[in-house]
Amino acid sequence: MTKRIVIGACMMALAASSMFAAKNKGGKVLNIYVWNDEFPARFNDFYKSKNPKALQGVTVNFIQTPNQNNAYQDKLDEALLNQANAKADDKIDLFCIEADYALKYVDTTYTLDVMKDIGLKAKDVANQYQYTKDIVTDSKGKLKGVSWQSTPGGFVYRRSYAKEVLGTDDPAKVQAMISDWDKFDAVAAKMKEAGYFMLSGYDDAFRAFQDNVKSPWVKGNKITIDPQINRWIEQTKTYSDKGYNNKASLWSAESTQGMMKDGKVFGYFAVGWFYDFCMPHGEGSAEGDWAFCEGPQGFSWGGTWICGAAGSDNVDIIKDIMYTLTCDTNTLKDICVKAGDCINSAAAMQELSKDGYKNAFLGNQDPLPIYLKNGASISKKTMTKYDQGCNEKIQAAMKDYFEGKVDLDTAWDNFYTSVIELYPNLKR
């Protein structure tokens, strides 16, 4: 797309940065809790590099702990519990959360009210997708976090394999061939016959099913199983037995290898952050040989929200970070163009698409119309604070079933046992 430099806007941004630096009376250390490199990259590339005066004299510390097995939450919980007694330079200022466990932190006094405590206005977040605000709104209606992302999903597939097996790599035509699960299964059989795997492994389709559940994981204190979860189990067992998948686990080396230029996996259920942040780019990768379509059913997956921590002495900086990264249209466009992220503004994406946005990783396809269509219908009404644990434990328990190590009844017993160990207040 054509990149336009608007001199007036740039001058205003510089002036705002100078004014901010002059009036900031906060602390000298900014502590940010994260689980991976994603937010540090967005912070450094789209905030720190463009607002150097805002951080003059301030040391930024990223405290990073992996998300798996509840490690990040455990680390964050410990720090939040000690927040009141921590030294000023040791207090948490910002921390990241994701959808699977957002409610755990939103409905507490550990998170600052974005409007009342931090100072953003309703007009600032007006263009953000409603579901991204609903996820981080507490039971009293207070907004407790913001995100630069929206996360509508689809199916990202290899163009060259589509041409070879299906006769076309055109996203609209490929979509017509996989527009429901029966058609998707039929294409999986064709891919197998041609020497390819439809999916990488056991977990690839999980989010496409799980995000379409009608009932939450937990009602009261009872674990519930939605039919969509059973459909995922049935399909994945079939794909594993028939060789339609490569029997890999998500995030494994085998799964990543399937994404490389010489990989044999046809496609992955993905959202913007997945193919931008998790799929290989550069030498040896299949960059440019991918395309994006809606897939058999719409879904969303994940997303990162930033929350201000109660007790922070850097509220001015927190406000500036939140506004710049999640409310400022020019910054959001920049994130989309340079990082490939699906941004949290339908208006900004519409402008980018109109201006000829192309994604090089996707063979210069414009995926924004798909994002705009799927993003408008996302609902998170079935979310609970137990989602991360339940999602992780069901995938772990069923892996043994998919591999033939246990029968289905045993896999279910193992699932319930592991969830109740994690959340002792629950029952099957």
Predicted regions and their residues:
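Short, low-complexity disordered leader/linker segments with a strong preference
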Residues: 1-30, 420-428
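Extracytoplasmic/periplasmic substrate-recognition and gating elements
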Residues: 28, 56, 81-82, 281-348, ...
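Short, polar/charged alpha-helical segment
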Residues: 35-61, 394, 412
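Extracytoplasmic "Venus flytrap"/periplasmic binding protein-like
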Residues: 52-128, 164-165, 259, 266-267
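Hinge/lid segment of periplasmic solute-binding proteins
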Residues: 84, 93-154, 182, 287-293, ...
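Glycine-centered hinge/linker elements that transmit conformational signals in sensory
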Residues: 183-192, 219-253, 279
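Long, aromatic- and glycine/proline-rich binding clefts that accommodate carbohydrate-like moieties
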Residues: 336-400, 426-428
